[in-house]
């Protein structure tokens, strides 16, 4: 939820579909998105929130740090804040999928998921613009 609005008009399976429509570089990223779409996460949680939440919090701070200065140029404050939250939530959700499929998770898994997200989404102006457009439609 950002600025009193929500991105939950789409389920995680629907967000996975949206991400699958974007340009992709690595087949392993496609695999992750398909796993997100198909994996039941009932009962799955981070094993030790005291360990994981600070790292994930810093990930959100990073996305806000990267997106909000861009909003000064394009005026998309709400959309860019929502993009930062969606990016954080997507990586967190993919981490939960990893736990569901592999039974455990280590910091290197988070780093790899974040690296893939950055390469596939964050550093593709076209993908970011498409996601900003899709976000604006649900805000």
Per-region residue spans from a language model:
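Hydrophobic, aromatic-lined core segments that form the binding pocket/scaffold
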Residues: 1-139
């Amino acid at each position: 939820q950002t600025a009193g609005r929500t991105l939950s008009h789409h389920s995680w399976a629907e967000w996975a579909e949206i991400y699958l429509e974007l340009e992709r570089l690595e087949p392993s990223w496609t695999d992750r998105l398909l796993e997100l779409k198909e994996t039941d996460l009932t009962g799955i949680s981070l094993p030790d929130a005291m360990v994981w939440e600070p790292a994930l919090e810093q990930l959100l701070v990073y996305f806000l740090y990267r997106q909000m200065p861009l909003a000064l140029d394009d005026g998309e404050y709400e959309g860019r804040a929502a993009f930062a939250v969606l990016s954080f939530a997507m990586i967190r959700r993919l981490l939960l999928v990893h736990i569901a499929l592999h039974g455990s998770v280590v910091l290197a898994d988070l780093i790899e998921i974040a690296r893939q997200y950055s390469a596939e989404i964050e550093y593709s102006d076209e993908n970011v613009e498409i996601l900003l457009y899709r976000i604006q439609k649900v805000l």
